[in-house]
């Protein structure tokens, strides 16, 4: 049995909590420690009980608090070598990671944390490096895919393996292209190493999800170029084109950008 909690999912800050009865981890650390403490405490949880932190990539909204978390709570932080170097270069990380708390992982490597198996996989994004994570117990497969420019074969395979998926649904293309962003930023977002749109994200799920998929959460929605109702509506429209119905074939939810979710218990 897995437990899942989103502690922030936007360009302002990203952090996700996953736990079994025996171990608790965070994926990404872009939310201030004070907010993490408050939101965990409200749900009967505590930072002191976290066992490890896994980082997807070195953009500030995913790493701002990682140094404070590691040093204040004596937490091992798992990253690829390139992401680790990027963290220590990033001026937004005021407390750098020291060797004591650094755990370097390779892509496709599986790390066992208690009864949880965490496997990284490569995803395309314009950071120093970027990975998604597959978190497994003996019963569940949970996949987190955020900040991706396009769907690679690796990502497609991870979607097919999952019972539960957190996946980026960053922007509506029309809102982005008609919006106030400068041309270079629009180009960056739409590139193969930028961010995935609502429609492309939905198509990825529709084409590659297995019948074992139970639940999907949309994450990392742009505040300027998207909104939750539009992301959901786009997903529902694309799914129907493939003969799938949200709420029937699997549950579909949208994670809040700057507010923590409820603590969810996941069962297959």
For the regions a language model picked out, list residue spans one by one.
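Active-site metal-binding motif and surrounding structural segment of the metallo-beta-lactamase
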Residues: 34-80
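Structured catalytic core of nucleotide-sugar glycosyltransferases
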Residues: 5-15, 58-62, 66, 77, ...
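Cap/insert and terminal regions of metallo-dependent hydrolase folds
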Residues: 153-252
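Conserved beta-strand hairpin/beta-sheet module of binuclear metal-dependent hydrolase folds
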Residues: 1-43, 131-147, 164
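Metallo-beta-lactamase
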Residues: 81-132, 136-139
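Active-site neighborhood of phospho(di)ester-bond hydrolases with catalytic His/Asp-centered motifs
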Residues: 27-30, 51-58, 78-81, 143-146, ...
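Active-site environment of divalent metal-dependent phosphoester hydrolases
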Residues: 12, 60-63, 85-86, 128, ...
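Metal-dependent catalytic neighborhoods of phosphoester/phosphodiester hydrolases
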Residues: 64-73, 88-91, 226-233
């Amino acid at each position: 049995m897995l437990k899942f909690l989103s502690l922030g999912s936007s360009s302002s800050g990203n952090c996700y909590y996953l736990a079994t009865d025996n171990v608790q981890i965070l994926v990404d650390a872009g939310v201030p420690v004070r907010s993490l403490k408050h939101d965990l405490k409200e749900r009967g949880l505590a930072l002191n009980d976290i066992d490890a932190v896994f980082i997807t990539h070195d953009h500030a909204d995913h790493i701002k608090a990682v140094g404070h978390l590691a040093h204040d709570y004596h937490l091992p932080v798992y990253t690829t070598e390139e992401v680790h170097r990027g963290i220590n270069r990033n001026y937004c990380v005021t407390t750098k990671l020291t060797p004591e708390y650094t755990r370097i992982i390779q892509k496709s490597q599986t790390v066992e944390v208690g009864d949880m198996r965490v496997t990284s996989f490569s995803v395309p994004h314009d950071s120093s490096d970027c990975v998604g994570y597959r978190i497994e117990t003996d019963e569940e497969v949970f996949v987190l895919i955020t900040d991706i420019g396009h769907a690679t074969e690796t990502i497609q395979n991870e979607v097919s393996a999952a019972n539960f998926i957190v996946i980026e649904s960053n922007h509506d293309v029309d809102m982005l292209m008609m919006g106030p962003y400068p041309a270079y930023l629009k180009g960056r977002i739409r590139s193969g190493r930028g961010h995935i749109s609502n429609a492309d994200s939905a198509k990825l799920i529709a084409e590659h999800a297995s019948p074992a998929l139970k639940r999907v959460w949309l994450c990392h929605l742009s505040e300027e170029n998207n909104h939750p109702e539009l992301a959901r509506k786009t997903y529902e429209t694309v799914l129907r084109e493939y003969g799938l119905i949200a709420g029937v074939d699997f549950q579909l939810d949208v994670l809040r950008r700057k507010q923590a979710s409820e603590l969810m218990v996941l069962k297959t």
